[in-house]
Amino acid sequence: MKRAVVVFSGGQDSTTCLVQALQQYDEVHCVTFDYGQRHRAEIDVARELALKLGARAHKVLDVTLLNELAVSSLTRDSIPVPDYEPEADGIPNTFVPGRNILFLTLAAIYAYQVKAEAVITGVCETDFSGYPDCRDEFVKALNHAVSLGMAKDIRFETPLMWIDKAETWALADYYGKLDLVRNETLTCYNGIKGDGCSHCAACNLRANGLNHYLADKPTVMAAMKQKTGLR
């Protein structure tokens, strides 16, 4: 039996990954992390979606220690979430240092326990937002270290790594879940479900990608299929 663990936040990217994983694996587990995030509604959204989509199990892990160590606008009410700035350089204050290091490592430990061969994460380098822990080289390096440390080949899969946000919408549509991803996920840094606040970087990236996809579905769908190998 093929098993996978999806690092699941209930946002657009991880939900699209879950939708695909459910088609590719016999048994899919979801792991969501409570790290004291500013908008805890995402945990409830993740629970609802994991149940609705048919995950074998959904585990919420308490990693609130991260909140004590990692200062970010996503973990501190006193730090405002910035509006989207297209020309902004550097690492944004929405970056949570060490988050993906911790999440992927703990997801791999869980995968070991449930005998899953893969850990799936929705990180993406094409729409790079200044987060160093979303880079392909980081994921591969950590995957190598974790496999060595566990003496087990647990594969880190990044199905969205080389597709852009428009193509991510196309991937959701390919599996017949575009409306669900649009209306029932929570991607917004200000904690607003669906289309979100329209001001933060996450909402702008999501909206621009959707508009691009809806404006030229055949071209974007074809590009997504070419990059992912889907037919």
UniProtKB/Swiss-Prot annotation:
Q: Which InterPro entries match?
A: QueC, Rossmann-like_a/b/a_fold
Q: Does the keyword Glycosyltransferase apply?
A: no
For this chain, the family text in UniProt reads: Belongs to the QueC family.
Cofactor(s) the protein needs: Zn(2+)
Tell me a GO biological process for this protein: queuosine biosynthetic process
Question: Where ATP is bound, by residue?
Answer: F8, S9, G10, G11, Q12, D13, S14, T15, T16, C17, L18
| Pfam families linked to this entry | QueC (PF06508)
Report the GO molecular function annotations.
ATP binding; ligase activity, forming carbon-nitrogen bonds; zinc ion binding
Q: Tell me the NCBIfam families matching this sequence.
A: 7-cyano-7-deazaguanine synthase QueC, PRK11106.1
Its EC top class is ligase
What does the note under cofactor report? Answer: Binds 1 zinc ion per subunit.
Q: What is the lineage of its organism?
A: Bacteria, Pseudomonadati, Pseudomonadota, Gammaproteobacteria, Enterobacterales
Q: Enumerate the Gene3D superfamilies for this protein.
A: HUPs
Binding, Zn(2+): C188, C197, C200, C203
Entry keywords, A to Z: ATP-binding, Ligase, Metal-binding, Nucleotide-binding, Queuosine biosynthesis, Zinc
This enzyme catalyses: 7-carboxy-7-deazaguanine + NH4(+) + ATP = 7-cyano-7-deazaguanine + ADP + phosphate + H2O + H(+)
Q: What does this protein do?
A: Catalyzes the ATP-dependent conversion of 7-carboxy-7-deazaguanine (CDG) to 7-cyano-7-deazaguanine (preQ(0)).
Question: In which organism is this protein found?
Answer: Escherichia coli (strain ATCC 8739 / DSM 1576 / NBRC 3972 / NCIMB 8545 / WDCM 00012 / Crooks)
EC number(s) given by UniProt: 6.3.4.20
Protein name listed in UniProt = 7-cyano-7-deazaguanine synthase
